[in-house]
A protein has these predicted regions:
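Catalytic Tyr-X3-Lys loop
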Residues: 111-129
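Conserved glycine-rich Rossmann-like NAD(P)H-binding loop of the short-chain dehydrogenase/reductase
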Residues: 42-58
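Active-site loop of short-chain dehydrogenase/reductase
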Residues: 20, 92-94, 136-147
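Conserved mid-core segment of classical short-chain dehydrogenase/reductases
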Residues: 101-115
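Rossmann-fold scaffold of SDR-type NAD(P)-dependent oxidoreductases
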Residues: 25, 93-101, 146
Length: 147
């Protein structure tokens, strides 16, 4: 049996390492929010990004000294630059988590619903993951995770 080129590490193992800067796209709700809270409790500095500025600001109130925020929409062309700005604001990045995807039941197969889903889950994914991967490649590595 061949070994996989991918290394899967348990979350608790990641938290025990010296890494301490994470960026989470989609941290204002759901799994992204739970991961952000867990990382904060482990002493991490985090950068969070999402579309709703008010939700980002509300979340930052939990631990203002540990949280940087950036409003961005992964479907917009400027989102890669905004992610770069958040990385810079945080002073670097050791872990990147993309937790922003959408899905709808579309029983009538309305084209705009499907196109919006593709813009978020394909185009947005590509923008964010490419930006994070480029940062890690140029800065000696890191961990990239997608939900």
């Amino acid at each position: 049996m061949e070994s996989s080129p991918f290394k899967i590490e348990r979350f608790d193992y990641l938290c025990s390492k010296k890494m301490k800067r994470a960026i989470i796209i989609g941290a204002t709700s759901g799994i992204g929010k739970e991961v952000a809270q867990r990382l904060l409790s482990e002493g991490w500095q985090i950068g969070i990004a999402g579309r709703r500025q008010s939700a980002l600001e509300d979340f930052r109130q939990i631990a203002p000294e540990q949280i940087k925020i950036q409003s961005l929409d992964v479907t917009q062309e400027d989102s890669a630059g905004k992610l770069d700005a958040l990385i810079h604001q945080l002073g670097g990045m050791d872990l990147f988590l993309l937790s922003s995807g959408i899905g709808f039941q579309n029983m009538d197969l309305k084209m705009e619903i499907e196109l919006n889903t593709a813009r978020t889950n394909v185009e947005g994914f590509t923008r964010m993951v490419d930006t994070a991967f480029s940062y890690f490649r140029n800065n000696g590595g890191g961990h990239l995770a997608v939900i």
